[in-house]
Design a protein with these regions (language model features):
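Adenine nucleotide-associated cytosolic modules
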Residues: 1-268
């Protein structure tokens, strides 16, 4: 049976003394498997804190390499890893932070052919992608695999976050946005820009929600959309109800598999 070692008890002592965590909770974190879709702006801070928290297995999925323009916000990487696959750069960083965890690196883009095999190996999925088509693909795959999804996005000075778990009766991503917007209608981060530290804020919130889900503590945001405005320093929570006409999780679904045209419009 998996137990905490003496060094682990010392490493996670500030967790263990928390009434809502304790030794049993830390064991839950050790046994947990979390998949990060994207090892970039959101995946970097989320990965760092999940590794430090003692998540036993972390998966990194990204088909991109480290570019100089990434380093303004993607803190899992550095000048020394320019040109390396992001997942390999991230794997080295997370393993250096916590050598007791397992970090799996998948140097590939997610698509309809590989997404189900990836998410099925993990308990919770964090979506840090930078385009709508990937977000819809990840949402749909997690729905069919019955996996909890923590989704975040950012645009210029604003970030959004929600937890998605329709298998527990909550709304899915398509309840909020039934279809992706037309290609080119909404600029991505490469075109519109993004405040570097905003990635840290939203990625850490993703990690926090994932830890809460694993431990079964706190209030879920599965029926809320959290909106953060960095300029005005304001957080808002907007109600996100289930859509009875949702094409995926509604009573009369139109989407029954991953045969749609999920065209990735931007790197993650």
């Amino acid at each position: 049976m998996m137990e905490l070692t003496e060094p682990e008890i010392q490493r996670y002592s500030r967790h263990i003394i928390l009434q809502d965590v304790g030794g049993k909770g830390q064991l839950k974190l050790k046994r947990a498997k979390v998949l990060l879709i994207g090892a970039g702006g959101l995946g970097s801070p989320a990965g760092l804190y999940l590794a430090a928290a003692g998540i036993g297995t972390i998966g990194l999925v990204d088909g991109d390499v480290v570019d100089l323009s990434n380093l303004q916000r993607q803190i899992m990487h550095s000048t020394a890893t320019l040109g390396e696959p992001k997942v390999e750069s991230g794997r080295k960083t997370l393993s250096a932070i916590n050598p007791d965890i397992t970090v799996n690196a998948y140097h590939q883009l997610v698509d309809a052919d590989n997404i189900l095999s990836l998410v099925s190996q993990y308990d919770i999925v964090l979506d840090g992608s930078d385009n709508f088509t990937t977000r819809f693909l990840v949402n749909d795959a997690c729905f069919f695999a019955k996996k909890t999804l923590i989704s975040a996005s950012m645009f210029r000075f604003e970030g959004q976050l929600t937890t998605i778990k329709p298998h527990q009766g909550y709304p899915c991503y398509r309840c909020l946005y039934p279809e992706p917007p037309p290609a080119g209608l909404v600029p991505n981060c490469q075109e519109a820009g993004v405040l570097g530290v905003l990635a840290g804020t939203m990625g850490i919130l993703q990690a926090s929600e994932a830890i809460k889900e694993i431990l079964g503590i706190g209030e879920t945001v599965a029926d809320k959309l959290v909106i953060y405005d960095a300029l005005d320093m304001k957080f808002r929570k907007v109600s996100r109800p289930k859509d009875p006409t949702c094409p995926l999780c509604g009573p009369n679904p139109k989407i029954k598999d991953l045969s749609l045209d999920y065209t990735v419009s931007c790197t993650i």
